A protein has these predicted regions:
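Ribosome-associated RNA-binding proteins
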Residues: 1-125
Length: 125
């Protein structure tokens, strides 16, 4: 589960390396976010190629959670878990900032209507 002040890895080519969760969107009592939720983040570290970076340090963006360490039970009885908590950055309109997502993403994003993120990802689990 992702909550406020959690450090997350960025899995797209927007130029950011790590982000910190500021707010979990989705209601005033919602304290934790899971796979497929949207959160508000601030950029903590950038990748080494700063000239190509589409984002700046300490700026605020929205992000979609694409991988979590918490396991996810599928309908066929299998459990799926990832090794890291990862997000993909998006702009105010909800479109991805990067043009590629590195690593696999979960198929549950397909049910939550994030087709643009699925189309730029490398694989589904």
């Amino acid at each position: 589960m992702i909550q406020q002040q959690t450090i997350l890895k960025v899995s797209d080519n927007s130029g950011a390396k790590t982000v910190r969760c500021i707010k979990v969107l989705g209601g005033f009592k919602k304290k934790q976010a899971s796979l497929g939720d949207i959160i508000v983040v601030s950029i903590q570290k950038l990748r080494k190629l700063k000239k190509i970076s589409k984002v700046k340090k300490k700026e605020i963006y929205k992000a979609l959670i694409i991988r979590t360490k918490i396991y996810l039970k599928k309908k066929n009885g299998f459990y799926v878990e990832f090794q890291e908590n990862a997000v993909a950055l998006m702009n105010k309109q909800g479109t991805p900032i990067g043009t590629r997502i590195i690593g696999p993403i979960s198929k549950t994003l397909k049910k939550k209507k994030f087709q643009k993120f699925i189309s730029i990802s490398s694989g589904l689990v």
